[in-house]
Each structure stands twice: as C-alpha cells, then as structure tokens.
C-alpha cells in the first residue's frame, strides 16, 4: 500500500 497523500496516478 502507498502512504497517505500519495498519488500513483497523480
């Protein structure tokens, strides 16, 4: 999982 606030797709 990615950290909070992280946007993989922006």
UniProtKB/Swiss-Prot annotation:
Localization in the cell: Secreted
GO cellular component: extracellular region
Recorded GO MF terms: toxin activity
Keyword annotations from UniProtKB, A to Z: Amidation, G-protein coupled receptor impairing toxin, Secreted, Toxin
Domain of life: Eukaryota
Record-listed Arginine amide modification sites: 10
Record's function text: Causes constriction on isolated rat ileum preparations and relaxation on rat duodenum muscle preparations at amounts higher than bradykinin. Is a partial agonist bradykinin receptor B2 (BDKRB2). Has insecticidal properties. May be related to the predation of insects by the spider webs.
Similarity-based family: Belongs to the bradykinin-related peptide family.
Note: Has been extracted from the spider web. Negative results: does not target bradykinin receptor B1 (BDKRB1).
Protein name: Nephilakinin-2
Organism: Trichonephila clavipes (Golden silk orbweaver)
Lineage, top ranks: Eukaryota, Metazoa, Ecdysozoa, Arthropoda, Chelicerata
